[in-house]
Amino acid sequence: MRISLGYPAWDAEEAMLRQRNVSTPLATCVDETNLRGMQRHIEKMHVNDSVIRYILKLVNASREPGAYPNPLSPRASRALLQGAKAWAFMFDRDYVTPDDVQAVFEAITAHRLNGTSQSSLDGASLSKRLFDSVDPLAA
């Protein structure tokens, strides 16, 4: 998965540089036990066959001869499923919808379709083209 957080504002980056050797301890937001529990919950999450078919249609559309420079691999399929499950979990659901797949689609596929982590712009447009070519209701 690739996401961009952007760059800090001038003042924030300047403050960061001025604090050279000052380390700020991070507060724990989740302990290991809770994290493992969340992971187990996500693994057990229900995924309807129509969502699986939707992911397969998206991935297979990328594999049409000449359609995309770097078709999506089975690893991308798994990443889409895991990403969609995690997205659903963040919204306190124990099931996955096509909307969850759509929410994580570009972040998971753009760099894969483009074949490089350097320029995600082309990858993002490739992701959008692929995403727009598959109807989630037809899955």
Task: Locate the predicted segments by residue.
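C-terminal engagement/docking regions of AAA+ P-loop ATPases
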Residues: E64-A139
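Conserved AAA+ ATPase core "coupling" helix
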Residues: M1-K57
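Amphipathic, well-packed alpha-helical segments that form the structural scaffold of globular domains
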Residues: L56-N60, E106
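Preference for short coil/turn "hinge" residues that link or interrupt alpha-helices
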Residues: S23, T28, M38-R40, R63-P65, ...
